Amino acid sequence: MKKTVPYINNLKGNRVISMMTAYDYPTAKAVSEAEIDIILVGDSLAQVVLGHDDTLSVTVDEMLHHVKAVTNAKPSSLVVADMPYLSYHINVSDSLKNAGRFIQEGRADAVKVEGGEKRKEVINALIDAEIPVMGHLGLTPQSKNLMGGYKIQGKTLDLAKKLFEDALLLQETGCFAIVLEGVPTIVAQSISENLTIPTIGIGAGKYTDGQVLVIHDLIGMKSKEYIDAKFVKRYGEQYDSTVKALVEYKKDIENSDFPGEEHSYDMGSDIQDSLKEWKKE
């Protein structure tokens, strides 16, 4: 069954919502097979796939390339496309065109936008254009320069109140769900309990309506120099197992153990004899 926006909305209060990032066809197939509710094609691909230092460098065209790869897998999960930096910051017209491309060309089911009150006009326009919108509050990575880095948000009473107000505003504006990132557990819990739409937490404690992680963090597809955030739990060590497989492959070809007979194609003995005679000519 293909999961839809109304389906996700109806999960609030009934069971925890699962969300996971995916950036390509095989990963989307795996996430769908695991029956994860939502696939986020996150701008985090700028870092974990393209090797940038932050999410600010990825473009709409680059994001669209990966959104198409994910939707080609025809996942049962709801597919949400992250709108990258500057794709919805300049004016409403550009925002509509960019979001429309993710829906029309990328075949995403919804888009995600970072920010609260200052995004109200854009979110209104997107929803008026029949584009479902997921909000994102708290530690919003596209604002890292203003925040002075990746810092936990809402740690004072005034900042917690602002997050609460922004969450209510996003709900009133028409967002179908909100990601809460990098906020104290009690703040995320309070927001979640006072909204009628689902909240999806990442570094926001266990009392949100759902959880999301970056899949490269979850499966351990990161080299040794990367240090996991506090909120990450690894469920695998894919990087290490990949390196191990590559080392074994290299050893096998150097020792002529691969390819073996079972990996090779043969031809009839009469044709082989003819080929040998032809080579002698």
Which residues does each PLM region occupy?
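Alpha/beta enzyme core
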Residues: K2-G236, D240-E281
